Amino acid sequence: MAVQQNKKSRSARDMRRSHDALEASTLSVEKSTGEVHLRHHVSPEGVYRGRKVIDKGADE
């Protein structure tokens, strides 16, 4: 088992952990359809920034 050579201070430990906090994902509402989707992602209907970018067929 690994053993540390020198003890890390509380400050060093907390500074390392400062980026570990969880954040809620940012959601956007599509203007044309009103759907909610992740930022910079295509909506489930295939619309991105008001334009149809994925043509979903009748079988899907």
From Swiss-Prot:
Q: Name one GO biological process term.
A: translation
A single cellular component GO annotation: large ribosomal subunit
Q: Which SUPFAM superfamilies does this entry report, sorted A to Z? A: Zn-binding ribosomal proteins
Amino acid composition bias (Basic and acidic residues), ranges on this chain: 11-22
Database matches in Pfam families: Ribosomal_L32p
**Among its keywords, does the record have Ribonucleoprotein?**
yes
| Keyword terms, alphabetized | Ribonucleoprotein, Ribosomal protein
**Stretches the record annotates as Disordered:** 1-60
GO molecular function list: structural constituent of ribosome
Q: Tell me the NCBIfam families matching this sequence.
A: rpmF_bact
**What HAMAP family does the record tag this protein with?**
Ribosomal_bL32 (MF_00340)
Tell me which family the UniProt entry assigns to this protein.
Answer: Belongs to the bacterial ribosomal protein bL32 family.
Record protein name field: Large ribosomal subunit protein bL32
The scientific name of the source species is Ectopseudomonas mendocina (strain ymp)
Which gene underlies this protein? rpmF
